[in-house]
Amino acid sequence: MLVVFFLGILGLLANQILGLPTQAGGHLRSTDNPPQEELGYWCTYMESCKFCWECAHGICKNKVNKSMPLIIENSYLTSCEVSRWYNQCTYSEGNGHYHVMDCSDPVPHNRPHQLLKKIYEKEDL
């Protein structure tokens, strides 16, 4: 009984450290609009998801990482859906491309999209 209690406490602490919620079961149904309190987690490992950016007039700023440069809205931003079931976190780009990882051992999936990112320069106006 003590072991079960200890593992339960350890699981709750891991969720708080990783920024994951302590909702019933910790599950998140597939969504393109994850809870605000989870953006820090999701946008760290797949920064090209549209829900990570706030865009106006073709210029976008990252909602989570304020030190990121402004970017030009282009094909770098993808319409992602994210989901979580037990310890499996999934990013789906809707075109058959998806990335699955252990939520407690996340792996960034930013590289495929980095080539498309265009940093905003004042001369671009």
Swiss-Prot record:
Matching InterPro entries, A to Z? ASFV_fam_110
What start and end residues bound the annotated signal peptide? 1-29
The record's keywords, sorted A to Z, are: Early protein, Glycoprotein, Signal, Virion
One Pfam short name:
v110
Where is the short sequence motif Prevents secretion from ER located?
122-125
Please report what switches on or represses expression of this protein.
Answer: Expressed in the early phase of the viral replicative cycle.
Q: Where in the cell is it found?
A: Virion; Host endoplasmic reticulum-Golgi intermediate compartment
GO CC list: host cell endoplasmic reticulum-Golgi intermediate compartment; virion component
Instruction: Give glycosylation sites per the record.
Output: 65
Q: Describe the task this protein carries out.
A: Causes the redistribution of lumenal ER protein to an enlarged ERGIC compartment.
Q: Which family does it belong to?
A: Belongs to the asfivirus MGF 110 family.
Protein name listed in UniProt: Protein MGF 110-4L
